[in-house]
């Protein structure tokens, strides 16, 4: 007798567990400029990420080139912090001691003094003509075509402003007219005069406050711009002017380690000594640029490339760690005499002071790779005596303006403030998200229009979902049976989430993420439309989950601020939720009342009431940031939208209707012209149509048909056949015309 299964052995223990087949989760890879490839990202200590970013040199307004780097790094920082959940410690510097700042501060000070001195008109004319001599020499010596073109534009403007003042002086014009011409010349010649005044008097400036006022002002403007762009503030902000003692100590240790040398009160880094060291490599980022004297001299600064300065170096490839100050330059005490820091050493000393001997990430613009970042790496590794000061070097791509190179020195740039006059900070950020952070971004009307349309597309989806979620139901009514459409949409949702995660792991590929999000919304829109056709209510919980996820991703990217659960904030991130929850119940009541009135008005054909209802929808409520959408047979949809957005939509609609009407009128006018031309042609008798063309034909038969050309040669059979067809067509047209005349149907 066999045992029953209850008595069988081994049945009281669990069976072996069958593990699912799982694909290994992708890890985050970042494009590392040190290897020029995507590398798996591993912080050096647990989940903490130490990050240093090169900040601005503050001597002028921040422009879209700055925005390219700082918005892009802000996105990367937020993704690492809020998506991958790293503990990011972010340090950024402000360069407030630099050749550009010194020169600009001197020029601004001297030009302001010159303007305030109110020079006589004849003196101004003479000074501008004198300043033109070295300026024209500078143009002739400039090889860069873009820079040459910029200088020539200045020369043209100055020359155009010179002539009226000269003419007015020759004619003894009145004081008011002379003053007007002088002001025009002063404005046109500001760059030219500033250079000339600096050459004459720059060395006489000894007041250090002149060199601190300029960067202090522009740093303040920079922070305002970053706040307007919703860029996170750094955890630590370092200013060069506050770190001079640390920089001096940093330079001294490099000298002590044998990689620096003193020359005429300045200190230089020996690139040869460093490169020959067994444990070091010079120019890790761009080794092929070693010896590029143009790039090296740009890195040294305009005030540091004179013949006497360059002769102090042991090698042209060496660079300044400490610069002996000349007259007219700010200075600080050091073991080598009064001087100021070199550009590259500033970042090394400040970053080293905060982050130590090695950091996880260093970021900056693509154009900083050589010599700035390569020199940073060399001097820092010489100081710390290691070969890993930076583990991952990230460089944001260039920014072009409508396909053209952007350059502050070439005066071809758009300030951040100007850009924010045309588009919102969110739209700018969306434009950046729709492109790879490491590739060139073209800032153009097409680029921004794509971002605006993306924002509108997402916003309409969020507004539609919010409207669906507001439909009254009890809590159990929110949960309905899932049919095939819901299962398919949910599968699509999770597929898109996986694709988005994979894209973020792949060098934080926001471009792909944005496309996947757009595709997901398109699927949702198709689902909602299918439900509408079937006269079924869409699944709220599924749409809530998807829209909440999309909102959370846009929050990660910094495109949404505040506590908004679904969609973009309305009326500012702080009061968005309160505004919507407060006013929406009243708007719903108003909408329902309006719908009831419209139904009665339609039944009784009261057109005046229907017109008032349309006026409320089209003109009154948009002024308050409310959009009503009427759908035949369905409840009116109520949407809260920014007032400016609605008014812009209204204006665009008006322009579109005007354009449509203009095209309609143009088509009618063309049709009328064509009909008039046809009528005129119909009036011509076939016997006259060729006889008028004496430049082509010389002889005709009795019906007016041509037989010979202008030279008296008889027409060929082919020509005759072709002309006969035209003749017969005209016969038919003229016959129709005669019939119209007989019937009285022509004017």
UniProtKB/Swiss-Prot annotation:
<feature type="binding site">
    <location>
        <position position="376"/>
    </location>
    <ligand>
        <name>Zn(2+)</name>
    </ligand>
</feature>
<feature type="compositionally biased region" description="Polar residues">
    <location>
        <begin position="15"/>
        <end position="25"/>
    </location>
</feature>
<feature type="short sequence motif" description="'KIIK' region">
    <location>
        <begin position="100"/>
        <end position="103"/>
    </location>
</feature>
<feature type="binding site">
    <location>
        <position position="54"/>
    </location>
    <ligand>
        <name>Zn(2+)</name>
    </ligand>
</feature>
<comment type="function">
    <text>Catalyzes the ATP-dependent ligation of cysteine to tRNA(Cys).</text>
</comment>
<feature type="binding site">
    <location>
        <position position="347"/>
    </location>
    <ligand>
        <name>Zn(2+)</name>
    </ligand>
</feature>
<keyword id="KW-0862">Zinc</keyword>
<feature type="binding site">
    <location>
        <position position="372"/>
    </location>
    <ligand>
        <name>L-cysteine</name>
    </ligand>
</feature>
<protein>
    <recommendedName>
        <fullName>Cysteine--tRNA ligase, cytoplasmic</fullName>
        <ecNumber>6.1.1.16</ecNumber>
    </recommendedName>
</protein>
<feature type="compositionally biased region" description="Basic and acidic residues">
    <location>
        <begin position="651"/>
        <end position="683"/>
    </location>
</feature>
<keyword id="KW-0067">ATP-binding</keyword>
<keyword id="KW-0479">Metal-binding</keyword>
<dbReference type="InterPro" id="IPR015803">
    <property type="entry name" value="Cys-tRNA-ligase"/>
</dbReference>
<keyword id="KW-0436">Ligase</keyword>
<dbReference type="InterPro" id="IPR014729">
    <property type="entry name" value="Rossmann-like_a/b/a_fold"/>
</dbReference>
<dbReference type="GO" id="GO:0006423">
    <property type="term" value="P:cysteinyl-tRNA aminoacylation"/>
</dbReference>
<dbReference type="InterPro" id="IPR009080">
    <property type="entry name" value="tRNAsynth_Ia_anticodon-bd"/>
</dbReference>
<dbReference type="GO" id="GO:0000049">
    <property type="term" value="F:tRNA binding"/>
</dbReference>
<dbReference type="GO" id="GO:0004817">
    <property type="term" value="F:cysteine-tRNA ligase activity"/>
</dbReference>
<comment type="similarity">
    <text>Belongs to the class-I aminoacyl-tRNA synthetase family.</text>
</comment>
<dbReference type="Pfam" id="PF01406">
    <property type="entry name" value="tRNA-synt_1e"/>
</dbReference>
<dbReference type="GO" id="GO:0046872">
    <property type="term" value="F:metal ion binding"/>
</dbReference>
<dbReference type="GO" id="GO:0005524">
    <property type="term" value="F:ATP binding"/>
</dbReference>
<feature type="binding site">
    <location>
        <position position="55"/>
    </location>
    <ligand>
        <name>L-cysteine</name>
    </ligand>
</feature>
<comment type="subunit">
    <text>Homodimer.</text>
</comment>
<keyword id="KW-0648">Protein biosynthesis</keyword>
<keyword id="KW-0030">Aminoacyl-tRNA synthetase</keyword>
<feature type="short sequence motif" description="'KMSKS' region">
    <location>
        <begin position="405"/>
        <end position="409"/>
    </location>
</feature>
<feature type="region of interest" description="Disordered">
    <location>
        <begin position="700"/>
        <end position="721"/>
    </location>
</feature>
<keyword id="KW-0963">Cytoplasm</keyword>
<keyword id="KW-0547">Nucleotide-binding</keyword>
<feature type="region of interest" description="Disordered">
    <location>
        <begin position="1"/>
        <end position="26"/>
    </location>
</feature>
<feature type="binding site">
    <location>
        <position position="372"/>
    </location>
    <ligand>
        <name>Zn(2+)</name>
    </ligand>
</feature>
<feature type="binding site">
    <location>
        <position position="408"/>
    </location>
    <ligand>
        <name>ATP</name>
    </ligand>
</feature>
<feature type="short sequence motif" description="'HIGH' region">
    <location>
        <begin position="56"/>
        <end position="66"/>
    </location>
</feature>
<feature type="binding site">
    <location>
        <position position="95"/>
    </location>
    <ligand>
        <name>L-cysteine</name>
    </ligand>
</feature>
<feature type="region of interest" description="Disordered">
    <location>
        <begin position="651"/>
        <end position="685"/>
    </location>
</feature>
<dbReference type="InterPro" id="IPR024909">
    <property type="entry name" value="Cys-tRNA/MSH_ligase"/>
</dbReference>
<dbReference type="InterPro" id="IPR032678">
    <property type="entry name" value="tRNA-synt_1_cat_dom"/>
</dbReference>
<dbReference type="GO" id="GO:0005737">
    <property type="term" value="C:cytoplasm"/>
</dbReference>
């Amino acid at each position: 007798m066999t045992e029953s299964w209850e008595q069988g052995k081994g049945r009281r223990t669990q069976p072996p567990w069958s593990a699912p087949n799982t694909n290994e989760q992708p890890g985050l890879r970042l494009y590392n400029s040190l290897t020029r490839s995507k590398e798996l990202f591993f912080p050096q200590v647990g989940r903490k990420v130490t990050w240093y970013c090169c900040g601005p040199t503050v001597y002028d307004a921040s422009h879209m080139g700055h925005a390219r780097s700082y918005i892009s790094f802000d996105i990367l920082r937020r993704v690492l912090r809020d998506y991958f959940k790293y503990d990011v410690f972010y340090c950024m510097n402000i360069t407030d001691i630099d050749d550009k700042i010194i020169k600009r501060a001197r020029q601004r000070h001297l030009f302001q003094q010159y303007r305030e001195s109110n020079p006589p008109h004849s003196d101004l004319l003479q000074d501008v003509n004198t300043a033109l001599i070295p300026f024209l020499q500078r143009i002739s010596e400039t090889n860069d075509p873009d820079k040459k073109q910029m200088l020539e534009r200045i020369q043209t403007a100055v020359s155009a402003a010179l002539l009226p003042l000269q003419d007015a002086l020759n004619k003894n014009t009145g004081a008011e007219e002379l003053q007007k011409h002088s002001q025009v010349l002063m404005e046109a010649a500001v760059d030219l005069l500033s250079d000339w005044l600096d050459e004459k008097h720059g060395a006489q400036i000894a007041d250090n406050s002149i060199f601190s006022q300029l960067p202090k002002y522009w740093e303040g403007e920079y922070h305002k711009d970053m706040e307007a762009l919703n860029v996170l503030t750094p955890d630590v902000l370092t200013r060069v002017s506050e770190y001079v003692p640390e920089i001096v100590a940093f330079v001294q240790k490099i000298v002590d380690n044998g990689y620096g040398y003193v020359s005429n009160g300045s200190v230089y880094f020996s690139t040869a000594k460093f490169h020959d060291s067994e444990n070091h490599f010079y120019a890790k980022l761009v080794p092929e640029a070693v010896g590029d004297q143009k790039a090296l001299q740009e890195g040294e600064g305009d005030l540091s490339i004179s013949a006497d300065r360059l002769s102090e170096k042991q090698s042209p490839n060496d660079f300044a760690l400490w610069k002996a100050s000349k007259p007219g330059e700010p200075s600080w005490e050091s073991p080598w005499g009064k001087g100021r820091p070199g550009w590259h050493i500033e970042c090394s000393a400040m970053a080293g002071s905060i982050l130590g001997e090695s950091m996880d990430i260093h970021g900056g613009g693509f154009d900083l790779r050589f010599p700035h970042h390569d020199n940073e790496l060399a001097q820092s590794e010489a100081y710390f005596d290691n070969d890993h000061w930076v583990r991952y070097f990230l460089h944001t791509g260039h920014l072009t303006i409508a396909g053209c190179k952007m350059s502050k020195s070439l005066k071809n740039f758009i300030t951040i403030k100007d850009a924010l006059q045309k588009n919102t900070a969110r739209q700018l950020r969306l434009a950046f998200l729709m492109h790879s952070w490491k590739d060139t971004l073209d800032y153009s009307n097409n680029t921004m229009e794509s971002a605006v349309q993306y924002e509108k597309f997402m916003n309409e989806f969020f507004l539609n979902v919010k409207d669906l979620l507001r439909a009254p139901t009890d809590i159990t009514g929110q949960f309905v049976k899932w049919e095939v459409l819901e299962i398919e949409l949910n599968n699509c949702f999770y597929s898109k989430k996986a694709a988005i995660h994979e894209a973020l792991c792949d060098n934080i590929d926001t471009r792909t993420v944005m496309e996947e999000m757009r595709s997901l919304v398109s699927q949702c829109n198709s689902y909602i439309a299918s439900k509408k056709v079937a006269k079924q209510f869409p699944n709220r919980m599924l749409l809530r989950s998807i829209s909440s996820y999309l909102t959370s991703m846009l929050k990660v990217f910094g495109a949404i601020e505040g506590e908004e659960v679904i969609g973009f904030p309305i009326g500012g991130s702080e009061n968005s939720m309160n505004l919507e929850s407060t006013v929406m119940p009243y708007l719903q009541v108003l909408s329902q009342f309006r719908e009831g009135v419209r139904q009665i008005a339609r039944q009784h054909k009261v057109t005046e009431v229907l017109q008032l209802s349309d006026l409320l929808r089209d003109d009154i409520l948009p002024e308050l940031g409310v959009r009503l959408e009427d759908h035949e047979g369905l409840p009116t949809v109520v949407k809260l939208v920014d007032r400016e957005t609605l008014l812009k939509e209204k204006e665009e609609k008006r322009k579109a209707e005007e354009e449509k009407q203009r095209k309609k009128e143009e088509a009618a006018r063309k049709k009328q012209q064509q009909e008039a031309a046809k009528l005129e042609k119909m009036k011509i008798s076939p016997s006259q149509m060729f006889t008028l063309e004496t430049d082509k034909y010389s002889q005709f038969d009795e019906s007016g048909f041509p037989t010979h050309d202008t030279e008296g040669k008889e027409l060929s059979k082919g020509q005759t056949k072709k002309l006969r067809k035209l003749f017969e067509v005209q016969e038919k047209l003229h016959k129709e015309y005669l019939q119209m005349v007989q019937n009285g149907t022509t004017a």
